Every structure is written in structure tokens, then in C-alpha cells.
Amino acid sequence: MSRAGTWLKMLGAGIVICVGGPAFVQSIRPTDEELFKRYNPELQRRSLEEGDRRAQEFDDYVNRLKQWSKSDKSIWYAAQEQQEQKRSEAEALRNQAKDEARAQREEMRKELLGGK
């Protein structure tokens, strides 16, 4: 009987730990509203202002991950390719802006030289 009693005690203790532990954690964890109320007013205001922007950024990121996962390549390679593509586009825009500025300077020079 002592072995059966020991097993029953251990089974009971296991059930209390496996069920009671998560239930206890759930009961003491504050809700999002309680956490928000603990913020100071400036943080509350900033959180409200930036909440939509952050949610949109997260949605964009999740959509990019979904797009990358459709590729046959690894997500990391797809992300790297997209970064390289953005970098090359930014470089092309920079070069275009430089060319436009150079053309504008040349026009200004011609106007100044032609006006003298």
C-alpha cells in the first residue's frame, strides 16, 4: 500500500503542478489594459500615436515574409536579394539626382556665361 500511496501522491503533485502552475501564472499576469494604465501619460500618448504605424509595419513585415516563403529559396536569401534590389534602386535614384543636379548646374553656368 505504501508504494501505491507514493504513486498517488506523486500523481496528485504532478497534476497540481501541471494544472495549477499555468493557472496561477494566468491569474497574476496583468492584461494589456492594466499595463497601459501603468504607463506615464507621455508614454500612453506616444503609444496611442505610434500604435497604428507599428501595426502597419508589422503587417508589412508579415506580408514580406509570406512573399519570401513562396519562393523556392530560403527566406534569408530572398530577404538578402530584396535588400540588394532596394540598395540598387536607391543607388539609381542617387545617380539620377546627381545627374539632374549636374545638368541644372550646367544650365546655370550657361545662363551666367551667356548673360555676360
From Swiss-Prot:
Its main location: mitochondrion. Keywords: Chaperone, Coiled coil, Membrane, Mitochondrion, Mitochondrion inner membrane, Transmembrane, Transmembrane helix. Residues 77-112 form a coiled coil. InterPro entries: Cbp4. One of its GO terms (biological process) is mitochondrial respiratory chain complex III assembly. Residues 86-116 are annotated as: Disordered. It is found in: Mitochondrion inner membrane. It is a single-pass membrane protein. The keyword Chloroplast does not apply. The chain crosses the membrane at residues 7-25. The keyword Coiled coil applies. One of its GO terms (cellular component) is mitochondrial inner membrane. Belongs to the CBP4 family. Essential for the assembly of ubiquinol-cytochrome c reductase. It has a direct effect on the correct occurrence of the Rieske protein, core 4, core 5 and apocytochrome b. This is Assembly factor cbp4. It comes from Aspergillus terreus (strain NIH 2624 / FGSC A1156). The gene is cbp4.
